[in-house]
Amino acid sequence: MNILSFDTSSEKFSLAIYRKNQIIYYYSRILKKKYSKYLIPIIKDSLIKVNMKIKQINVISISVGPGSFTGIRLGIAAAKGLSMPYNISLLGFSN
């Protein structure tokens, strides 16, 4: 199972990609209020680095709080936008 997981609930953005229950890629960066500019490009670049396409992801997990209301909304919107065309399951987690 391939999982894309990310957290947009604080100034520090975190992303992990799991393959067969092992983390194969991890990325973390202070983004503050720049999520709308960098979120999708970071996800795209991360998938390229592990030689995967979004359609190979089985589950997208996203932080649902507590944290920044706007950050959480952006993360959920991105996760939903990425998941819908490929019928990828969504999973929310608390941080």
Language model features by range: what are they?
Residues M1-V64:
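N-terminal beta-alpha supersecondary unit
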Residues S10, S94-N95:
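Short beta->alpha linker loops
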Residues Y35, L74-G75, S94:
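Catalytic-loop motifs flanking and including active-site residues across diverse enzymes
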Residues V50-K55, M84-S94:
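Phosphate-handling active-site elements
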Residues V59-L90:
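DPxDG-like acidic metal-binding loop motif
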